Amino acid sequence: MNRWTGCQNLKENLKESKRNLKEPNVITAIRKKGYDVFEQDSKPFNLNIVAIRSNDPKVNVFNDHMHLCWKYRGQWNDFNFPITCDAGLYWLNNPMSKLGTAIVKEGQYKGLWKTGLHRGKYFALVQKNPVTVIRDYNKDDKIDLESGVEQSGHFGINHHRGNSSKESFKVGKWSAGCLVNPHPRIFEIEMEIFREASKIWGDSFTLTLIKESDL
């Protein structure tokens, strides 16, 4: 059976993704760090979700990236786009927790997400398994990854979009710690990929978060 049957629209949408026999550099980077790489390639969409936190310390902008990489019949695919890995300025200064705003710590989080509804409203990836966050509590308009205050657990760290109809340029209130895609159309394509992946490989998605300097 052709696993692409029934997802012609997705094939059209993925024309811009990079296809190459060579391993993507983000996959090489996470492999070097000792993280698991999913590369069983008899069926498509065995996803490696790699988020890259920018070296640029500027806050409230979508200056990070996410790569959805999978290998199919010996050929790698790399669909990538801008995101934010970090909370917006509003939530940095108005944390939901008295311990501070949640910033996802770099690492690999097995089965972190499943498909579901973000805040009960629209299809997204929602937290299923524990994640480790660093608490930024000093309200200094900067992302503080060295506070020393860490927590592991369920904090509603989802992957969702910003504005539903147009691209978002400032993070603002869109993220209180979630990984957020600023572009609604690209997010729709993402969700098509996750739907297909969950049918084939199960409804469980691992996040690997690294620094730009790891590349």
Regions found by a protein language model. Give the residues of each.
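Helix-capping/helix-break motifs at membrane-protein junctions
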Residues: 182-183
